[in-house]
């Protein structure tokens, strides 16, 4: 596709370029299974007329805006919805709609470091999102990287060991509610208990929960542990464009109002501002508000259940075929052996790490899509990659432990 910028391009040529681009996107959408994006938002076309305006939610969502071209009322409605979901009263929380999960993480650690525990050490598992380590570098925080269990969950013994060694320093802790690659969920209650066992008082630690992917799944699943502000956590961030679905990248950050104590009053925008960004997208609050209003708790619960069931369905199919595979409880991320062919990986938009690949089962990924992927995978495995009896699938014992199905499986036990 020719998309270089030329002077005075005709409308006909522009339309031709965009039409070709749209056709490519529509075709590739069928194969987008490796990254957590919900593309089921055709109904958002209803909101297209808004694009004739510029909407900017600059500054604090809860303060007056100097112009009419904003969507702060919608933003506050979305924030109130999440505050209720995460069990914190309206007058006790503060938050805003971010550009994505990364900004939410940056804001959470900014609060933990700048406002509360300036000498605190940051504790994060090695399977945490890269933005956690970016925050440590940006804020020049002392980072304690914690080992992980084979399923990607934080290693609680290693955490305890490092907490005890650094007991003279406050702790700022990242909790993963769905790690980037394995979809692992850290046990918040166990981490809190570990802090208490190590002698940390409530005012000597700050917990940020990175719920980028699973934040809208766990609340609607029976027997899943609650992540709530009724527990001693400081902030929660979530991605809006992942499980919920939004055409533009966005996220939600919620914290305790008492933590946002030194807001900067900016005369130019007539607003206090404790956000990371200056100008903020005024469209994303409306898209999120619209989607939450259309779906409600019932549809979100159904989406959550369906995705978990479909993830188990894919796991079972791979397992029956003798393929190394792992799926965490309450997760929609299916980890399996990395395909040999880069073209296959590219065709199905798979995310890969070392000898592993994963599929993230989002709303819109149907069993028909899963069956199509599985059929394609088996065709490649049986007639191309491993047709030669000497060619063997990789051993994933180091990454998947007993979930590895390679020829050396007996040696793993």
Swiss-Prot record:
Reaction catalysis annotation: L-histidine + H(+) = histamine + CO2
Keywords for this protein: Decarboxylase, Lyase, Pyridoxal phosphate
Coiled coil region boundaries: none
Modified residues (N6-(pyridoxal phosphate)lysine): 242
Binding site for substrate: 129
Tissue: Ripe fruits; not detected in leaves and unripe fruit.
A family per Pfam: Pyridoxal_deC
Family indicated by similarity: Belongs to the group II decarboxylase family.
Protein name according to UniProt: Histidine decarboxylase
Organism listed in the record: Solanum lycopersicum (Tomato)
């Amino acid at each position: 596709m020719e998309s270089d910028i030329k002077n005075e391009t005709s409308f006909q040529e522009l339309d031709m370029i965009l039409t070709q681009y749209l056709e490519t996107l529509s075709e590739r959408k069928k194969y987008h299974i490796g990254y957590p994006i919900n593309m089921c938002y055709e109904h958002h076309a209803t909101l297209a007329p808004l694009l004739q305006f510029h909407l900017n939610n600059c500054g604090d969502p809860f303060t007056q805006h100097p112009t009419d071209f904003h969507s702060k009322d919608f933003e506050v409605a979305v924030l109130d919805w999440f505050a209720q979901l995460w069990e914190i009263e309206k007058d006790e929380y503060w938050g805003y709609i971010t550009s994505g999960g990364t900004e939410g993480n940056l804001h959470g650690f900014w609060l933990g470091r700048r406002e509360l525990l300036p000498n605190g050490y940051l504790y994060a598992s090695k399977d945490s999102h890269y933005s956690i380590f970016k925050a440590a570098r940006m804020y020049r925080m002392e980072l304690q990287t914690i080992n992980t269990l084979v399923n990607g969950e934080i290693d609680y013994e290693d955490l305890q060991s490092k907490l005890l060694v650094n007991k003279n320093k406050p702790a700022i802790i990242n909790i993963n509610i769905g790690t980037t690659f394995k979809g692992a969920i850290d046990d918040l209650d166990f981490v809190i208990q570990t802090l208490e066992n190590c002698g940390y008082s409530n005012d000597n630690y700050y917990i940020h929960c990175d719920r980028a992917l699973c934040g809208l799944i766990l609340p609607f699943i029976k027997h899943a542990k609650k992540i709530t502000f009724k527990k001693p956590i400081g902030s929660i961030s979530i991605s809006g464009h992942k499980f919920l679905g939004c055409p533009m990248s966005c996220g939600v950050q919620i914290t305790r109002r008492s933590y946002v104590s030194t807001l900067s009053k900016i005369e130019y925008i007539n607003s206090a501002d404790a956000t990371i960004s200056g100008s903020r997208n005024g469209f994303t609050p409306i898209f999120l508000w619209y989607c939450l209003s259309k779906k409600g708790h019932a549809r979100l619960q159904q989406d959550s259940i369906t995705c978990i069931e479909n993830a188990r369905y894919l796991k079972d199919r791979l397992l029956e075929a003798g393929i190394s595979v792992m799926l965490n409880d309450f997760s929609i991320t299916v980890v399996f052996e990395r395909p040999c062919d880069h073209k296959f990986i590219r065709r199905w938009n798979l995310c890969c790490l070392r000898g592993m690949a994963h599929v993230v089962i989002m709303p819109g990924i149907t069993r028909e899509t899963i069956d199509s992927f599985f059929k394609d995978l088996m065709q490649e495995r049986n007639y191309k990659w491993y047709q030669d009896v000497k060619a063997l699938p990789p051993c994933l014992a180091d990454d998947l432990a007993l979930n590895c199905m390679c020829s050396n499986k007996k040696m793993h036990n």
